[in-house]
Structure formats: C-alpha cells, structure tokens
Amino acid sequence: SETWVIIQGKAKVTIDGIEHTHHKGDTIIIPKKAKHRIENLSKVNLVFIEIQTGDYFDEDDIIRIQDDYNR
C-alpha cells in the first residue's frame, strides 16, 4: 500500500475510479492493488511525499493502465 501526504498545491487523486480533491496537509491512503493516479490542479508545483509499505519496493511492480507521459 501507499500513503501520500500533500506538501504543496492542490491535487486530484483518483483511486479505483473515484476522484477526490486534496490540499496541503491532506493524507491519502491507497490500498494494495488499487488503481490510483494523482494530478496537479494548481498553478504551482504539486509536492507530495509517498510512503510505501510492504515487502517489495521497485519500479517493476508498476502496471501502467494509462500513461499520459509515455513512460
């Protein structure tokens, strides 16, 4: 699972198809295996801290459903 903490800006967070707006100071809990996405809604940079928990931490555990940035 992951936890995101918004440090600066305004974000649209989508978890399993449900959208919420979050602001500085908000904490978002993302359940294991949930489809999730974060988008900047501010004119300033969106800054957030991501905390991962579990047994495995590597980029190859990511499954990109939609990639607007061609990663």
Regions found by a protein language model. Name each.
Residues T3, D16-K35:
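Short acidic-glycine-tyrosine-enriched beta hairpin
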Residues G9-A11, G25, K33, G54:
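Glycine-centered flexibility sites
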Residues S1-T14, I51-Q52:
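Short, conserved beta-strand element in jelly-roll/cupin
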Residues R37-R71:
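Double-stranded beta-helix
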Residues T3-V5, I29, I62-I63, Y69:
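Broad hydrophobic/π-residue packing in well-ordered secondary structure
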Residues K12, E19-T21, V44-N45, D55:
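Short, surface-exposed beta-strand-loop junctions and turns on beta-sheet-rich folds
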